[in-house]
Swiss-Prot record:
Superkingdom as given in the UniProt entry: Bacteria
Family affiliation: Belongs to the PufQ family.
Protein name: Protein pufQ
A GO BP entry: photosynthesis
Amino acid sequence: MQSQRLRAHGVQHVDRVPRPEFALYFSLILIVAVPFALVGWVMALVRERRIPECGPFARAWREAGEITPEIFRP
């Protein structure tokens, strides 16, 4: 691939380098999401009487990974 630009559905997408702001927002959202994910994990543990597939930290990581890009979307 000669160029770092991708074209999909008529829109150009440029590969972006992760910026310090992204890491900062990701870590802040992760810190806030961990307690809520822990509560959700415990509730699922009690409700289903078995250990959920992903742990509370993995759940918080996934949520932070979904929320943070939405902040920087143009």
